């Protein structure tokens, strides 16, 4: 499929993707070699606890959210990957992700006494949700991931960081992990807060009604997984077995490889096709303006271009 699309292109490949202010995105990033660097239990031999891991993740996330003006809707720290459902209010998603992932990586390396890569080299998978229903499913997907992965029977049992059960507008406080963050740096306050923000979906519902709708969807997902395991005579891993998982080990479950990384999460094929077509047109326009830039001709990159305008001041078009 990728070869066919490459043959259909009339321009050189464009790796850039539009970074649009106000986009609702589900960000997923995996650890290197699928190893359990994000395990809530860390290394018990060094005195690590789930509470310490949750606090480090929460502080790091809250610090980036406040710095880059992101609205966080859901988050879940799994053992070897994590999920963030967010609205990129100001169009700062690349810098936001860099802050989260670089600080998590450095902190985890410091914690475990290692010096190699923490994240997989493929970068994060960022999918845009084009409808209210898809956005709600993103929240439920993140909140219920420990259950759908077969780790715990109920999402509230998960020992890592999770927004499951957080009401919209609820704020929680995290304390600076002084073993990583410099207390003399003014960017690292002793305490920092993180608020779960309601996404701009189902606007006819109040915050409480939308929360109830989300929790009903989460309950449906959890019961479906429990029924599936019961029918297959399988058990969830459980906390005791999770606590024995070594952080340096890798997941043994089956993993699809060499698949195209999705950019749109839509169950409606028409909406998905429309969004993908808009993305193709954007890349074609970007390629044309990139050629103009290389040739020294006047250049105006399409709205949503990020790197060249931010770093080199290349003009960018205004929002349509």
Over which residues does each language-model region extend?
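Short catalytic/metal-binding and nucleic-acid-binding patches
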Residues: 1-320
């Amino acid at each position: 499929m990728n070869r066919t699309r490459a043959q259909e292109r009339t321009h050189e490949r464009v790796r850039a993707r539009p970074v649009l202010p106000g986009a609702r995105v589900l960000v997923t990033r995996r650890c290197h070699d699928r190893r359990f660097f994000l395990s809530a239990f860390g290394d018990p031999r060094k005195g690590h606890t789930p509470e310490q891991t949750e606090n480090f993740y929460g502080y790091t996330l809250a610090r980036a959210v406040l710095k880059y003006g992101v609205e966080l809707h859901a988050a879940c720290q799994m053992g070897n990957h994590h999920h963030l459902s967010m609205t990129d209010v100001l169009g700062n998603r690349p810098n936001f992700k860099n802050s989260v992932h670089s600080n998590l990586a450095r902190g985890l390396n410091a914690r475990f006494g290692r010096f190699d890569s923490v994240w997989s080299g493929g970068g994060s998978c960022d999918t845009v949700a084009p409808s209210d229903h898809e956005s709600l499913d993103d929240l439920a997907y993140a909140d219920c991931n420990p259950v759908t992965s077969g780790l715990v029977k109920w999402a509230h049992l998960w020992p890592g960081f999770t927004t499951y059960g957080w009401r919209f507008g609820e704020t929680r406080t995290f304390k600076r992990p002084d073993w990583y963050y410099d207390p003399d740096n003014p960017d690292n306050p002793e305490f920092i807060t993180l608020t779960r923000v309601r996404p701009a979906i189902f606007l006819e519902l109040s915050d409480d009604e939308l929360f109830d709708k989300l929790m009903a969807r989460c309950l449906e997902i959890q019961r479906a997984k429990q029924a599936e395991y019961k029918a297959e005579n399988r058990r969830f891993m459980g906390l005791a077995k999770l606590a024995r998982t070594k952080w340096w080990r890798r997941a043994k479950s089956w993993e699809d490889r060499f698949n195209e990384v999705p950019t749109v999460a839509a169950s409606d094929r028409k909406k998905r096709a429309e969004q993908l077509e808009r993305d193709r047109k954007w890349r074609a326009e970007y390629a044309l303006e990139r050629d103009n830039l290389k040739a020294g001709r006047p250049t105006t990159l399409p709205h949503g271009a990020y790197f060249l305008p931010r770093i080199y001041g290349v003009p960018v078009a205004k929002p349509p």
